[in-house]
Design a protein with these regions (language model features):
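Long, Lys/Arg- and hydrophobic-enriched amphipathic alpha-helices
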Residues: 1-115
Length: 115
C-alpha cells in the first residue's frame, strides 16, 4: 500500500480534531464536504497503523513500513548505482517533490506485507 496517511504514532492527528476527510473543488479546500455532491473531490488520510495491525492479525508479516521519502531514496540510490546514466535523464525536481519531507516525502507512507 502506498498512500498518504498517518502512522500508529500520529493517528489521530492532533491538528485535525474533526478527522482527515477533506473536499477539494478547483484545487481549493471546501468548507463542507457534503455540499455539491459530485462536484468536488473527497479524500482522507489512510490509517496505516490500523492497516498494519489488521494485516498482521490476519496472518500477514510486515516486510516494510516507512515513509515515501525513505522508500524512494533507497530505491533510486540502488538504481543510480547500477545505471548512472539514469541519473542524468531523471528530472531532479520531480524526484525532490516525491521525496522532500515538506512535499510528498513524509505524508505518503509505504506498507508492504506478505504471507
Amino acid at each position: 500500500a502506498l498512500d498518504y496517511g498517518h502512522g500508529p504514532d500520529d493517528w489521530p492527528a492532533a491538528n485535525q480534531p474533526d478527522g482527515t476527510v477533506r473536499g477539494y473543488r478547483c484545487q481549493k479546500l471546501v468548507d463542507d464536504v457534503l455540499t455539491d455532491p459530485g462536484k468536488q473531490d473527497l479524500t482522507a488520510h489512510a490509517n496505516f497503523g490500523l492497516a498494519k495491525q489488521s494485516g498482521e492479525a490476519a496472518g500477514l508479516q510486515t516486510e516494510l513500513f516507512t515513509s515515501q521519502e525513505r522508500f524512494l531514496n533507497g530505491a533510486f540510490a540502488e538504481m543510480l548505482q547500477s545505471a548512472p546514466a539514469l541519473g542524468q535523464a531523471m528530472d531532479v525536481r520531480q524526484l525532490q517533490a516525491l521525496t522532500h519531507p515538506a512535499h510528498m516525502g513524509r505524508p505518503f507512507r509505504v506498507l508492504v506485507q506478505s504471507r
